[in-house]
Amino acid sequence: MSFDFDATVVGAGAVGLACGRALARRGLSVLVLESEPHIGQGVSSRNSEVIHGGLYYPTGSLKARFCVEGRRALYAFLDSHKVDHRKCGKLVVATDEAEVGRIEAIFRQATTNGVEGLEHLTGPQARALEPGLNAHAAMLSPESGVFDSHGYMLALEGEIGATGGSVVVSTPFERAEPLSGGGFRIVAGGEGGATLTSRLLVTAPGLSAQAVAARIEGYPVERIPKGHFGKGVYFRLTGKAPFERLIYPPPIAGALGTHYRKDLGGQAVFGPDLMFVESEDYSVDPAKAEVFAGYIRRFWPGLPVGALTPDYAGIRPKLHGLGEDQPDFQLHGREVHGLNGLVALFGIESPGLTSSLAIGEAVSEMLTHD
């Protein structure tokens, strides 16, 4: 049977585009469908734009593996495509004796995960690197950084196009049904949308992962994990902060904690926090500035009064609720849902952006060896 496309990807964020690129590099004809008017308008555009080292994630997890592999691949990609980035390094800071044990546990986990160049630092050593920092002790991850995530996604889109693939925006996925001889019939484009056939199907739509999976005929409903919206807001600093590196506290339950970064334009940004919400809401409550200031002054006592201004908010596609353990990425192949030629992605939150190239390769491997 002939198909319109070898592979169709739902979602043109960083992960969907990375999946499309990986499949196109294997010689497949690729179509990427995006419901928004532009690529990367969802989770991929409302985050910290941090390149994570791979410090925190449990041994053997997909997050641990993909973050380290993806980070190495990402730096190489950014270099080769001349996408702006800065490998500034990260300090994870213990602000008192009680947090030192948590820093040591992160160091052990990161070492097990294969993260390179880690260093234990005393308080004076940390302050020598970053004057103004309140640090009882710290660990340095020199492989962490920041980058232009939109420039990265444009480069991915360009690679897909260069191989003859297509990224089509303003074209929402409506439904799909398996064909008797293999492959899928897909309807996309809203009311009166187009119908196409594809041998392979990848769903990577971020916050709508559960809704998209439910519109694939034959996908077992009980196999679709429950999704949660984890909202995080960011505040920017009026004026300059004295730090060049990323500054992180020890992680909190379900998130990495409210951290500092200097973006590529030199702007100091703090965030995100974590609040579970029922629907997409990207407002930022200015009253949260004082709460943020309390977090920040733990590692930067010199934060000026009234210096924080609301910046933006993002929502993470979480697979856990308040007080629940944070699960791994989920890549559902045939062994989960029973449908040949389909990989559905769920819960691709942090470190999904850093991991995107590795996720793309893994998905491509799953489909071409299915």
Predicted segments with their positions:
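N-terminal Rossmann-like FAD-binding beta1-loop-alpha1 element of flavoenzymes
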Residues: 5-32
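Active-site substrate-recognition segment that forms the wall
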Residues: 22, 51, 83-86, 194-195, ...
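C-terminal lid/capping helical subdomain adjacent to the catalytic/cofactor pocket in oxidative enzymes
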Residues: 22, 26, 326-370
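Glycine-rich FAD pyrophosphate-binding loop
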Residues: 25-46
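Dinucleotide-binding Rossmann-like beta1-alpha1 core, especially the glycine-rich loop
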Residues: 49-125, 135, 257-258
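Glycine-rich phosphate/pyrophosphate-binding beta-alpha loops
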Residues: 56, 144-146, 252-255, 343-356
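Short beta-strand to alpha-helix junction loop
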Residues: 58-69, 93-102, 140-158, 168, ...
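Helical element adjacent to the flavin cofactor pocket in flavoenzyme catalytic cores
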Residues: 139-200
